[in-house]
C-alpha cells in the first residue's frame, strides 16, 4: 500500500513499476481515504504502542493506494524491495532506501507474512475486486 506521503509525492507509479519489473502481477488496486475504523483494524497489533494514535491520524490524513500483487515469494521479496521500516536502515535500491528519511513518512506498507497478507487483502478488498488473469509474459518469467 502506498501511504499518504507516497501518494502526495507522486510515487504510486514508481512502486507499481518496481513490482511489475520484478515479474509480479498486479491483481487489485484502488485509491481511497481509509476510515479510522479500517486503520485501527489494520494496525490492531500496534494498538498498545504510544505512537498508535499518531499513526492512525497520519494514515487518514490523505488518500492511500492499497494494492495486491501475485507471484512467487511476493511477500518475502516484496519486503526486501520495500526496505526496512526505519528508512535509515534501508539499503539504497529499496523503495524506502531511495525515497524515505523518516519512519513516520516511510511511503509504503507491506505485509510481513503470508498470513498478514491474506488478512489485509480481506480488510481492504472484496473478492470481486481481485482480478484473476493470465499474463502473456508469464512463461518468460517462470519456468
From Swiss-Prot:
Binding-site residues, ADP: 3, 51, 79, 85, 96, 103, 106
Keyword Protease set for record: no
For ATP, which residues are the binding ones? 3, 51, 79, 85, 96, 106
This entry's Enzyme Commission designation comes to 2.7.4.6
The species this protein was found in: Schistosoma mansoni (Blood fluke)
Q: Which InterPro entries match?
A: NDK-like_dom, NDK-like_dom_sf, Nucleoside_diP_kinase
Misc = Schistosomes do not have de novo purine biosynthetic pathway, hence they depend solely on purine salvage pathway to supply for their need for purines.
Q: Name one Pfam family in it.
A: NDK
GO BP term, example: GTP biosynthetic process
Q: What is this protein called?
A: Nucleoside diphosphate kinase
Q: How is it used?
A: May be a potential antigenic target for vaccine formulation against schistosomiasis.
PANTHER family, sorted: NUCLEOSIDE DIPHOSPHATE KINASE
Q: What positions does UniProt annotate as the active site of this protein?
A: 109
Domain of life the protein comes from: Eukaryota
* The keyword Electron transport is assigned to this record: no
Q: Which family does it belong to?
A: Belongs to the NDK family.
Keywords on record: ATP-binding, Kinase, Magnesium, Nucleotide biosynthesis, Nucleotide-binding, Purine salvage, Transferase
User: Which pathway does this chain act in?
Assistant: Purine metabolism; purine nucleotide biosynthesis
- Needed cofactors: Mg(2+)
**Where are the membrane-spanning stretches?**
none
Subunit comment for this entry? Answer: Homohexamer.
Q: What does this protein do?
A: Major role in the synthesis of nucleoside triphosphates other than ATP. The ATP gamma phosphate is transferred to the NDP beta phosphate via a ping-pong mechanism, using a phosphorylated active-site intermediate.
Amino acid at each position: 500500500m502506498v501511504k499518504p506521503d507516497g501518494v502526495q509525492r507522486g510515487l504510486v507509479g514508481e512502486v507499481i513499476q518496481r513490482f511489475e519489473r520484478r515479474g509480479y502481477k498486479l491483481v487489485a488496486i484502488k485509491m481511497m481515504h481509509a476510515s479510522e475504523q479500517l486503520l485501527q483494524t489494520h494496525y490492531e497489533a500496534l494498538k498498545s504502542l504510544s505512537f498508535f494514535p499518531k499513526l492512525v491520524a497520519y494514515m487518514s490524513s490523505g488518500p492511500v493506494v492499497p494494492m495486491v500483487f501475485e507471484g512467487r515469494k511476493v511477500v518475502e521479496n516484496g519486503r526486501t524491495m520495500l526496505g526496512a521500516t526505519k528508512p535509515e536502515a534501508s539499503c539504497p535500491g529499496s523503495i524506502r532506501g531511495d525515497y524515505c528519511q523518516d519512519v513516520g513518512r516511510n511511503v509504503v506498507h507491506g505485509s510481513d507474512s503470508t498470513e498478514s497478507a491474506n488478512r489485509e487483502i480481506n480488510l481492504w478488498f472484496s473478492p470481486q475486486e481481485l482480478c484473476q488473469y493470465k499474463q502473456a509474459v508469464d512463461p518468460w518469467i517462470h519456468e
